[in-house]
């Protein structure tokens, strides 16, 4: 029986972890806009394809090449929609071969939930342009799945961490001494180890249901300050200073503040029951 073919769009850190998991089991293709990355992708068992989601003319052949697509590419950095996903779906529709598509979205589509614990049936309420672009991408993918019959699954992903992920370990922030909110004003955050996220991507490719959303999150359920306190203790570093929200407004960047303005806790029952994923790092204490 021939091996199925997977095309990865946006093959960065998580995509490379997926390649390692699927070597020898799938025929692997990876879209890249950088010729310099081709050798590294080949070393991981993938056939590199040069193309750019911002240049639709480079995508024409994609739809006829793969049985499944893992879409890990982010939207552009500006605007309220995602033209990259639109260009990709047009290319895939022309080929007619793709049967399965998994999209890596963000839990930011929910906006602020006031610390509530909820599952994937909660309505989206994006509070930033960054999140609105993701909501637009999800809507495009749902429409594409219904129209074409492709089995589309969406992973809504929180903060990704791993010691070997660039910028993906709290140690760097702790060493900079970046403050966190005082306990009374702190927000809940959610996390997933990069290795578990790669495994969730594979599980969704194999077992994800059509038009189904899954929270790709671990079991931690920590507030942000508690997360960094735990990381500091595990790394043997000083705990970060605590400041009020008013002080944070004056001292932190708009991007840092955006993560402090949203509080939510993600249920991951579907991830475990439907995708049958057993987390290797169920809490950040296991993975840091």
Question: Which residues does each PLM region occupy?
Answer:
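Mid/C-terminal beta-alpha module of Rossmann-like enzyme folds, strongest
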Residues: 200-201, 207-256
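N-terminal Rossmann-fold NAD(P) dinucleotide-binding loop
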Residues: 15-16
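Catalytic helix-loop patch of NAD(P)-dependent Rossmann-fold dehydrogenases
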Residues: 114-154
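Conserved Rossmann-fold NAD(P)-dependent oxidoreductase catalytic core, especially the SDR/UDP-sugar
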Residues: 87-129
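NAD(P)-dependent short-chain dehydrogenase/reductase
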Residues: 142-188
